Swiss-Prot record:
PTM (free text): The attached glycosaminoglycan chain can be either chondroitin sulfate or dermatan sulfate depending upon the tissue of origin.
Protein's name according to its UniProt entry: Decorin
PROSITE patterns membership: LRR
A GO CC annotation given for this chain: extracellular space
Signal peptide: 1-16
Origin species: Rattus norvegicus
C-alpha cells in the first residue's frame, strides 16, 4: 500500500509543469509559490490586496491590467502604488482613502482627463506623483504639501496657475515637457511658490521665451526643444544657484550681453542645435563654466577672447568640454591662442561644417 502511495505522489510530481513567472515579484518571494498572494482571512492587510494585483512588502502593483478605474480598496500600510499602463479615465474623491502612508503614486500612461480636487487629500505623506502620458488639460488642484517630485510630461496642459503650486515648499523636481504650453498660458511667477525647487524641465512645448519669475533655488533648468528665439539678461536675473542650463534644439539667434553674469555658478551651458551667429558673450569672464555645447549653429567666426581672458592667467575652473562642430567656421580660421586656458586636446571638438 505504501509503495502504491509513493508511486502515486511521484507521478503527480512528474505531471507538474515547469515554473512559470506570473508577476514582477515572483523572484522576490520566498514563501509563496507565485507572485499572487492568496486570500487569508486571518491577515486583513493581505486580504485587501485588489483582485489581480500583487502586494508585497507594502508595495501594490496593479500595472498592465487594463483597469478602467482605480480599485476600491488597498492595504492601508501601502507605501508605493503602481497603476501605470491601464485605461483609467478619472481619479475620483476617495480613490485613495486610508492610504496615509503612501509615498509614491504611479499613474503613468493611462487615459486620465479628470482629477477630483479632493482626490489626493488623504495622501498626507505623498512624496512622488507620476501622472505623465495622460490626457490632463490642467494641473490637479490641492496637491499634497509633502510632494517632492511631480512628473506631468506628455499631457494636454495649456496653463500653469500660480495657485496650484503655492505652498509646495518641499518640491524638488517638476517635469512638464511635452505639453502644448505657451508663454501666455504660464502665469507670471507661477512656479515661485515652490521655494526649494531644484530641477525644472519644460521641454518640447510651444514657449518662445524663458518663463519669467522662476524660483531662485533652481540648479537645473531644461528648456530643450521649444521655440525660444532669444536669451535676454532679464530672463535669468536672480538665478544665482543655476548650475545647468539646457537650451538645445530651439531657434536662438543671440544670447544678450550680461545674461551669463546673472548665473554666476553655471557649470554647463547647452546651446547646440540653434541659430546662433556668434559665441555667447561673457564666457571668458565666467569662473565656473566647464561644459559649453555650441555645435550645429550658424557661428562663422570665433574671436580670440571668446573663451579665455586676454592674459594667460588661468581660470578658476577649466573647460572639460567645448563643442563647435557643424558650424560654418573652419578650424583653421580659429586663432591658435583662442583656447589657451583649456587643458587637454580632447576637450575641444571642432570638426567640419557640413
Amino acid at each position: 500500500m505504501k509503495a502504491t502511495l509513493v508511486l502515486f505522489l511521484l507521478a503527480q510530481v512528474s505531471w507538474a509543469g515547469p515554473f512559470e513567472q506570473r508577476g514582477l515579484f515572483d523572484f522576490m518571494l520566498e514563501d509563496e509559490a507565485s507572485g499572487i498572494i492568496p486570500y487569508d482571512p486571518d491577515n486583513p492587510l493581505i486580504s485587501m490586496c485588489p483582485y489581480r494585483c500583487q502586494c508585497h512588502l507594502r508595495v501594490v502593483q496593479c500595472s498592465d491590467l487594463g483597469l478602467d478605474k482605480v480599485p476600491w480598496e488597498f492595504p492601508p500600510d501601502t507605501t508605493l502604488l503602481d497603476l501605470q499602463n491601464n485605461k483609467i479615465t478619472e481619479i475620483k474623491e476617495g480613490a485613495f482613502k486610508n492610504l496615509k502612508d503612501l509615498h509614491t503614486l504611479i499613474l503613468v500612461n493611462n487615459k486620465i482627463s479628470k482629477i477630483s480636487p479632493e482626490a489626493f487629500k488623504p495622501l498626507v505623506k505623498l512624496e512622488r506623483l507620476y501622472l505623465s502620458k495622460n490626457h490632463l488639460k490642467e494641473l490637479p488642484e490641492k496637491l499634497p504639501k509633502t510632494l517632492q517630485e511631480l512628473r506631468l510630461h506628455d499631457n494636454e496642459i495649456t496653463k500653469l496657475k500660480k495657485s496650484v503650486f503655492n505652498g509646495l515648499n518641499r518640491m524638488i523636481v517638476i517635469e512638464l515637457g511635452g505639453n502644448p504650453l505657451k508663454n501666455s498660458g504660464i502665469e507670471n511667477g507661477a512656479l515661485q511658490g515652490m521655494k526649494g525647487l531644484g530641477y525644472i524641465r519644460i521641454s518640447d512645448t510651444n514657449i518662445t521665451a524663458i518663463p519669467q519669475g522662476l524660483p531662485t533655488s533652481i540648479s537645473e533648468l531644461h528648456l530643450d526643444g521649444n521655440k525660444i528665439a532669444k536669451v535676454d539678461a532679464a530672463s535669468l536675473k536672480g538665478m544665482s544657484n543655476l548650475s545647468k542650463l539646457g537650451l538645445s534644439f530651439n531657434s536662438i539667434t543671440v544670447v544678450e550681453n550680461g545674461s551669463l553674469a546673472n548665473v554666476p555658478h553655471l557649470r554647463e551651458l547647452h546651446l547646440d542645435n540653434n541659430k546662433l551667429l556668434r559665441v555667447p558673450a561673457g564666457l571668458a569672464q565666467h569662473k565656473y563654466v566647464q561644459v559649453v555645447y555650441l555645435h550645429n549653429n550658424n557661428i562663422s567666426e570665433v574671436g580670440q577672447h571668446d573663451f579665455c581672458l586676454p592674459s594667460y592667467q588661468t581660470r578658476k575652473t577649466s573647460y572639460t568640454a567645448v563643442s563647435l562642430y557643424s558650424n560654418p567656421v573652419r578650424y583653421w580660421q580659429i586663432h591658435p591662442h583662442t583656447f589657451r586656458c583649456v587643458f587637454g586636446r580632447s576637450t575641444i571638438q571642432l570638426g567640419n561644417y557640413k
